[in-house]
Amino acid sequence: MTHPVLTALGLGANESGTYLGHGEWSKTSDAGVLEPINPTTGEVLGRVMASSQADYDLIVERAQAAFKVWRTTPAPRRGEAIRLCAEALRTHKDALGSLV
C-alpha cells in the first residue's frame, strides 16, 4: 500500500531514486534499496532504489554540461526557472512538510 504522503506527491510505493537528467530515471536495480522509516511509527514509507557509481558519474557529467548552458542563460530566464521551482514547492508544501 502506498503511503498517503507519497500519493499526494504523485509517487508510488517503489521509486527510482536517481534522476539522470534528460527526462531519464535510473533503472539500476543492483545498487540496493533504501527504505525510509517513519520514526514515530516504525512504518516503512516506501522503497527507493539506490544509485550506482555509474549513475553518479553520468549525473556529474550531465550537470557539468547543463551548467555551461545555465551560465549563459539571461538572468530573467534563470529567474523564471527558479520561480517555477518555488511555485512547485509551494504547491506541495503540506506533503513535503510532513516528511520533515
Predicted regions and their residues:
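Terminal low-complexity tails and localization/encapsulation signals of metabolic enzymes
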Residues: 1-47, 80, 84
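Glycine-rich loop-to-alpha-helix module at the N-terminal edge of alpha/beta enzyme cores
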Residues: 45-100
